């Protein structure tokens, strides 16, 4: 389905109040994951946010996903000779769009792609999309998924695999060379070991949204926007203490965090085995789990 153009022009001043007020930590060199054609890198910002960058192996165009803040993103791109050509937004929360006005001041020709249904809350759009749309960025097909639950008009971006993928269920570091699974930029709908709070949606909506993710190839890399994995899995282990997959993953995650490493990306297959929300049989079961997670103090 073709992308529908937005009905408004940019007005950077309209979002100036949305800029994140939390001080940005020093820029850390983020790890890159990908192959020869397109890579994904993550930039840690704020307390636990990740900004994602879709780019090639050298200087050239880049796409940024959910920029909470701008300064570390600008620095990261400029240090690598990358030119911002597009910004993808999954939803309207300020820790996902707060950096957009400043990024546009630096790269005024960059496109802003977001849900057309959220035009009032994400007013800088130059391309408005909806679930079922498909477009191309940096030579990759991008499928738009409507995934309400966390917010009314939350969307996700699924990029199908562009090369041979690794064996389903395989663990360990991502392989080097021309091997690339699909990518899922899911915002705050799916987290590693968890899911987003239901601020505007219902358990029925969230369950249906997670079912869309569960249907993706198991090797699909999951790029969720917050580092919540250790807490999510500690809660899951308290709910299912005899589940060996959850316990094993929790131990590995704690080791990774102690060493200063991110736990993102995850993979759909790993989430199917260890994420209680993705395993929920129906909306009622998900609602019980969400209530338990909300109340859990660790």
What is each stretch, according to the model?
Residues 194-220:
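Active-site-adjacent loop/tail segments of enzyme domains
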Residues 19-27, 167, 211-221, 228-298:
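Accessory terminal helices/loops
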Residues 1-18, 158, 173-175, 186:
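Intrinsically disordered, low-complexity proline-rich regions
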Residues 4, 8-82, 102, 107, ...:
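Zn-dependent metallo-beta-lactamase
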Residues 67-69, 92, 117-118, 150-151, ...:
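Active-site metal-binding loops of divalent metal-dependent hydrolases
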Residues 47, 62, 69-146, 160-172, ...:
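Active-site HxH/HxHxD metal-binding segment of metal-dependent hydrolases
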Residues 54-55, 158-160, 236-237:
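Short beta-strand-to-turn element immediately C-terminal to the catalytic PLP-Schiff-base lysine
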Residues 54, 66, 91, 103, ...:
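Divalent metal-coordination and catalytic microenvironments
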């Amino acid at each position: 389905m073709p992308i529908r153009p937005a009905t408004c022009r940019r007005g950077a001043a309209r979002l100036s109040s949305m800029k994140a007020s939390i001080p940005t930590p020093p820029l850390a060199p983020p790890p890159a994951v990908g192959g020869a054609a397109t890579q994904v890198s993550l930039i840690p910002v704020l307390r636990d946010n990740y900004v994602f960058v879709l780019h090639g192996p050298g200087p050239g165009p880049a796409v940024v996903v959910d920029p909470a803040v701008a300064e570390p993103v600008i620095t990261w791109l400029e240090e690598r000779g990358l030119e911002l050509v597009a910004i993808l937004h999954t939803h309207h929360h300020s820790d996902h769009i707060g950096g957009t006005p400043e990024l546009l001041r630096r790269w005024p020709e960059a496109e802003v792609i977001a849900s057309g249904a959220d035009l009032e809350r994400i007013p800088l759009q130059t391309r408005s999309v909806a679930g079922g749309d498909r477009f191309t960025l940096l030579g990759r097909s991008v499928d738009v998924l409507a995934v309400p639950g966390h917010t009314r008009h939350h969307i996700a971006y699924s990029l199908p695999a562009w090369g041979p993928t690794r064996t389903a269920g395989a663990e360990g570091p991502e392989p080097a060379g021309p091997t690339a699974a699909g990518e899922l930029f899911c915002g705050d709908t799916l987290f590693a070991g968890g899911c987003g709070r239901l601020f505007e949606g219902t358990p029925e909506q969230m369950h249906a949204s997670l079912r869309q993710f569960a249907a993706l190839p198991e090797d699909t890399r999951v790029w969720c926007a917050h580092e919540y994995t250790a807490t999510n899995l500690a809660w899951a282990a308290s709910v299912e203490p005899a589940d060996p997959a959850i316990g094993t993953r929790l131990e590995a995650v704690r080791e990774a965090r102690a060493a200063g490493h991110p736990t993102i990306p995850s993979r759909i297959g790993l989430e199917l085995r260890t994420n209680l929300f993705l395993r929920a049989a129906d909306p009622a079961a998900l609602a019980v789990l969400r209530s338990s997670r909300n109340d859990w103090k660790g």
